[in-house]
Amino acid sequence: YKNTINSTLRNLTLFHTMGNHDNEMEVGEDWAKSLKYTQNLAPDYYSFNIGKCHYIVLDNMDYEGIAAGHDNRSKYARNYTASQLAWLKKDLEHVDKSTPVFVTSHEPLSSPDGTGWDGELNGKDADLNEFISIFEGYDVRFLSGHTHNIYHRTYNQNFKEHNSGAVCASWWWSGYMTPGVHIAQDG
């Protein structure tokens, strides 16, 4: 991957977001599962500014409780850890409320059909509004993927989610990939 990026996309600046296939399943703890990723690509959560916009990258892939060596990448909680949420709140203290904020996590905040958030926040059942309230007063665009669908959701006037689907489109279940054309379901 790094060789391809360094040779093919070397003139682009890339910002990585950890997803459900980016963990090392042979080890035990969640932090250890993400160690190769954080040592080679990017921190699991971080922020940066480009122009007059603030970008926040969060990790909501929690593999806590998955035994070492058990490669079941579909068994995880959609969870923001307590330390990550504390960091997020501290980060936002340094961002003027008039600054546009873009937040990204691999998992979306709700499913394509609009049903609620089935994840956890700080290891407990989460209320989506509790997470969104952290960004009160900011104009936020939440960017997500994972679903293999493309959809947009407005949670309130200042918090909107754009789910981009997956770059692999539907080949993973259809077994069909049109050369040069990758299509994800819209809606």
Region annotations inferred by a language model:
Residues 92-114:
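Short acidic, glycine-rich surface-loop motifs adjacent to enzyme active sites
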Residues 22, 109, 149:
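Short active-site segment of divalent metal-dependent hydrolases/proteases
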Residues 19-20, 106, 145-146:
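Active-site glycine-centered loops adjacent to acidic/histidine catalytic or metal-binding residues
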Residues 1-97, 119-141, 152-186:
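Extended active-site neighborhood of metal-dependent phosphoesterases/phosphodiesterases
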